[in-house]
């Protein structure tokens, strides 16, 4: 019999879910007492690991003082102001501001709206086109569904948001052609610097630089979706730092709190904020009930403290080198078709005839969590506190799952 809970990204008729009841570090435990190495940081987000007492204590203290309150005009709170300042200090854009929401999906939809709105405020209401890329994942709200480049996730929902153009990933000539065609109707180009749920695809050499040049040439904003890549995953605070290419808007979520409380946001760079701030009578009419929620902001502050104190941004390099070496050893032994990744997020493409979902399930039975995405890919995005021994067990389990297929 199905439960009352309708699961996301699952068959509505499925009944045999594994119930996770606790977590500590990189290990989670299910209701049957089985332990798993969480090689996906839950869903790309638990950077500091599970069961961090400092975050739990900070939440309890905050809840006893101010658990929640609106930040709509005329209100604010000390925690959201402190977090905004903290985030701007590590932002890839100088003189940015921060808009808060509760998820990456909300962040993407907000970035799309702000890009279009900034053009309206600058006197260019014709600039409405958003260009996105194939394989891109940008959440499942209506805006994100409309721009994402994973076709099955777009199907069945009727008409989506208009004025969206999609181009092949990493094909700078295709992007140049699309931008020439749409010209001064383009609002923004939206990219994941490293595509995540689409299969973990880092950018090709020079691609992001080319996108920036084209945006400047055509007067379009560049939006980075850093919901997965932000907060140390690539060995830098943000992918914009990693690749040295400046965007105009950056979305974030996931590892900003390591998932202890949902939080998302958008860095609003100078080119966008200047358009929004130019008219003192302009009133920004977008936001969410929980924008700047004190508990979420407190969780983020405690989480960032841990990342800084424990050097987890730097540790991502070590994790990436060790995980990459292990996965490439499988490729050298002709066990996988391809290895892709950057920093501490990696994937393997299975050889023809190997089902990544079956690999996922076999690894679960061996006590290791991976994800299966697309037709051939298994992904790995472990907590940044994972030990070397745990990383080696991940690779060993993957090897065993493939060789016993």
Where are these regions (language model features)?
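Conserved N-terminal phosphate-binding loop of PLP-dependent enzymes in the Aspartate aminotransferase
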Residues: 1-405
